[in-house]
Amino acid sequence: MNENQRDKTRREMILRLVIHARKDSLISMRAEEMAKYMDVSKVTMYKYFSSKDEILSLVISHFANYMCNKDVLSTYEGESILERYQKTFEQSLMINYYFPESFFNDFKGYNPRLYEEIVDAQQFRFKHLEEMYRLGAEQGVFYPVNTAIFILEDELILRRILDPSFLVQHGLTLEKALFDYYEMQKRKLIRQKYLNIMDDSWIEELIPSFVAKNSRNL
């Protein structure tokens, strides 16, 4: 197996672990459990990773790479600020689904170095979102907003929406709750003139797809 194929396989195994272990503590997870979530044997897992610490380090690298994804956070020629906002909404949804608050708390107590990587990635994303909101306001597309509070709303509200007990308590489906939250946020952020011309077809595909793929893992 060449190095590129090996790296690809390692990334796929880490991704499977993150997807399937979102409810569990990675820090306290045994090697056998990690291998199970990766869908490989323990022996095979250790052919690709030298230790549990290496696996945890790569999980954080995966998180940081997604948080700092320039395809999401940067503006490209021909891309509107509205399209960029929609990409950041998807990113917020995925971050809050795959990386619950307990994930961060685990690493804060277990490994300060890895936790620092988490904080650095969060700060990188914050600065780029702050720039996006500032640019949108300058263009007259967005209302001026407090970036820190807007991001905090995503963390608090999306995590509650992704909690099945909240949905049951309020008689909501996950799909309706996500659509309602998206509508609420964009109406707080985007001026009416641009709401009237905004193309939400991509979000209308994203949310049902997310629900179909992930609702049973909540």
Predicted regions and their residues:
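Basic, helix-initiating cap at the start of DNA-binding domains
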Residues: 1-40, 54
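Conserved hydrophobic residue
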Residues: 26-27, 138, 142
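Short hydrophobic/aromatic patch on the recognition helix
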Residues: 38-49
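Short amphipathic alpha-helical segment with a characteristic S/N-K-E followed by hydrophobic residues
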Residues: 51-57, 66
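Hydrophobic alpha-helical connector segments
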Residues: 58, 69-99
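Amphipathic alpha-helical segments used for helix-helix packing
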Residues: 93-116, 130-131, 197-202
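Amphipathic alpha-helical packing segments from all-alpha helical-bundle domains
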Residues: 113-139, 148-163, 180
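C-terminal peripheral helix-coil segments that are non-catalytic and often amphipathic
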Residues: 134, 171-218
